[in-house]
Amino acid sequence: MKKCLTVEPLAESRHQEFIEFIYREFFPREPLALASGLAAKSNPKTVDTFVQWMHQGVSLVITDPETNRIIAGALNCLLKKSDLLFDVDYSCMEEEDKCIWMFLDHLEVGYNVFEELKVDSGMELVFLCVNESHTGQGLARRLTEETIAMARLRGIPFIKSNPSTPGILANN
């Protein structure tokens, strides 16, 4: 019998579980984390930032109904024109974190989505994580679709993302 998997908002009681899931299922397979060395360790400032984003109430998860464990998730955050995702001074970051965030910031040099769209807020789909044993089942696609639906429902004018991980199209 096929399991019914539902997308649901990330409950505060699951924040720590989701952080552990990210470090277990996302970073060890994510090219930027592997190249920078971030996959091998966690930085408390980065974890604190993830928790701040989770408290915004826009992250989503899929849980296995049999085990009640997270098997996929979308770490999302709300953006404001006046806010920066991290301090401009990267000196407070570990080298691995600094390397990734400076690279991602560099991708947006010369382009300001807020000015382009003439808006003051938006959303970022920061990470899509799927348990390795559940890849190729469309869970990342479902999380993306639900993130878009949530943004529309909330009147958020745009969603941005910097994908760096290939999507698995079929579970071989």
Where are these regions (language model features)?
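Conserved GNAT acetyl-CoA-binding A-motif
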Residues: 121-123, 151-164
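Conserved active-site alpha-helix within GNAT-family acetyltransferase domains
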Residues: 141, 152-154, 164-172
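Conserved acyl-donor/pantetheine-binding loop and adjacent beta-alpha core of acyl/acetyltransferases
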Residues: 67-127
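A short beta-loop-alpha structural element at the N-terminal edge
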Residues: 5-20
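A short helix-loop-beta-strand connector motif used in the catalytic cores of GNAT acetyltransferases and
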Residues: 47-61, 72, 79, 84-85
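Conserved acetyl-CoA-binding loop-helix of GNAT-fold acetyltransferases
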Residues: 124-130, 135-151
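Conserved GNAT-fold acetyl-CoA-binding loop/helix
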Residues: 28-47
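Conserved beta-strand-loop-alpha-helix junction that forms the acyl-donor binding cleft
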Residues: 126-132, 160-171
